[in-house]
């Protein structure tokens, strides 16, 4: 199975294919294509290739680099003109892309990108208090606006526990967050996004818990 996966990546991750992807992004009227969700995942892929122990990964990383740098620059430009964060629990969520982008920036020691993300995160989220998490989830969301923001800020602020206590002061009582979302029809491709919400919530909670003291009431 591993050999098949490696062969498949070798087949698809080529200079020619990356050039086609880059051309698609840089064509007229595509400035907002896959922004910011696709940006975050592309940078996450680059990070995985950078940190992978597979002997082929270094070649894949270099092959992807032209597209990676283009997306990196697009993210910086986007953050420079984004007046307000997007908090919806779908592809447009700002905090989700910033969390992935920040991990990439630190992995490759891109201080310029890191600072751009830190500045944006603090501008958007540092003053947030009493987030209305009891209104979650939306009917076809797969990201928790509350938990994804908290995940990002656990990577941003030095005093995360204090920030978190103001952001979600009664988190343990928020039934909507503390219980899995109900998926009533998995044949409906939009409603089935709620399965993804349960997974992404668990991912966020795992990271958030590690950033809080063991005796934290949440």
Where are each of the predicted segments found?
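Extended ligand-binding groove/face enriched in aromatic
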Residues: 1-105
